Amino acid sequence: LGNICRSPLAEGILRSKLPSNFVVDSAGTGHWHIGNPPDARSIKIAKEKGIDISNLKGRQFSKQDFSDFDYIYVMDNQNYKDVIALASHENEKAKVKLILNELFPNENVDVPDPYYGLQDGFNNVYNMLDEACNVIKEKLLKNKPR
């Protein structure tokens, strides 16, 4: 929702797995944390895994993102509804996918929001996102134009 917990982790994880010519970004559907760094607990687990997300800043998803990105992964069903509501046509809607559907096709499983929990919740979210990003990486590298 606010682009400080799950989505910066996903951005950092996916960016670490892809060549530098891929553009990876994250955004929240809410405006609460625009310009803020990721939650300290997200930064901590990412750092433990060798990924630095401390320089990321929260931003809000915008209609322009449909033009700027080929794939838009969301963390939960509410984010999905919020992003789909901004889409102007079916081509834009087709870009939006729940990230855990990469692991559990058509299950529409949410990545739990760890914000109100303890560090363990962030660790679990990291592991889920890492697995999903491995699948995404393989798909992107397989489909990349030569």
What are these regions (language model features)?
Residues 1-68, 138-146:
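Conserved active-site segments centered on acidic
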Residues 71, 81-146:
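Phosphate-binding/catalytic loops
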